[in-house]
Regions:
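Charge-rich, low-complexity intrinsically disordered regions
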Residues: 1-112
């Protein structure tokens, strides 16, 4: 799968999930506007590596600390969570479980 198509699929899954909050991301990290990148693209390419959170509901540093295998393979932590982690029972932060976020309607998991 080529990188452009993979990026498209990842962005689509993230937007559908509800775990990327553009307003939160821009207000929490004002430097993002200076990057000339769309905020979601910034998170995927730069922000996650810097430990930035895509929303209040997903803690990038927490997820990587508690899932060292994710850090080791180098996949974006939010992408990993949506593809595998949620189904494996991994939590997106230290405040809520995956089940709680789904029950509250914050997280939308795909059925694939």
């Amino acid at each position: 799968m080529n990188k452009r198509f993979k990026d498209y699929i990842n962005k689509k899954a993230i937007l559908k999930s509800g775990l990327f909050d553009k307003k939160y991301y821009l207000s929490t990290y004002p430097d993002v506007e200076k990057s000339n990148l769309d905020p979601l693209t910034h998170y995927l390419q730069i922000g996650a590596k810097e430990g930035k959170n895509p929303s209040k509901e997903f803690d990038t540093k927490y997820y990587l600390k508690n899932n060292p295998d994710v850090k080791e393979i180098g996949i974006n932590p939010l992408v990993h969570f949506l593809r595998y982690g949620a189904k494996e029972g991994r939590n997106p932060n230290n405040l809520f479980s995956t089940e709680e976020l789904v029950a509250k309607g914050i997280l939308q998991l795909s059925r694939d």
